[in-house]
Amino acid sequence: HASMPIGAYSEKQIMPQEKLVIVPDGISNEIASCIVLKGITAEYLLHRSYSAKKGDKVLFHAAAGGVGQILCQWANAIGCTVIGTVGSKEKEAIAKKNGCHHVINYTDTNFVEEVEKIVGKNGIDVVYDGVGAKTFEGSIECLKVRGMMVAFGNASGYVHTLDIKKHINAKGLFFTRPSIAH
């Protein structure tokens, strides 16, 4: 998968060796290109946007998606308590199988109330939100004092405004909107 510098849609590209990954036999280029982007995304979310550590309480929206499946397994392996949200009954088993200790279907359940039942009133250390508009306000409610909101996607729509007094001052929260290009 070649994305930087210019040439992502080229049939061939000259790349620096340190930017390349050897693909094992038996894995097609199509599969490898999908895995690499999702894996890179999971890595920068879990280690560069917020450095998750053993004992952290993590909330990941869209836990059954490509990035979610990788990140939830990884966070579980680190020793985090992993809470994942999904948008359908079918995806609950996928999220559970891929490292979520707790799975919440946010289409038929108030995920804010469920998170509080799981972790108590102190809240979540970090929320990884790739959903966007539908989950943004609730995600903020779930965070602990000085918690971190990592907003990396907008599958349900963009969050157009951020009320600093309401969203940040109330709990002293941290926000980031990371990009793998940086």
Q: Language-model features: where?
A:
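Adenosine-nucleotide cofactor-binding segment
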Residues: 76-138
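N-terminal Rossmann NAD(P)H-binding glycine-rich loop of SDR-like oxidoreductase domains
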Residues: 64, 68, 72
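N-terminal Rossmann-like NAD(P) cofactor-binding module of classical short-chain dehydrogenase/reductase
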Residues: 1, 59, 104, 125-128, ...
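NAD(P)H dinucleotide-binding glycine-rich loop of Rossmann-like/cofactor-binding domains
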Residues: 1-62, 74
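Hydrophobic/small residue at the entry helix of a nucleotide-binding pocket
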Residues: 41, 66-67, 134
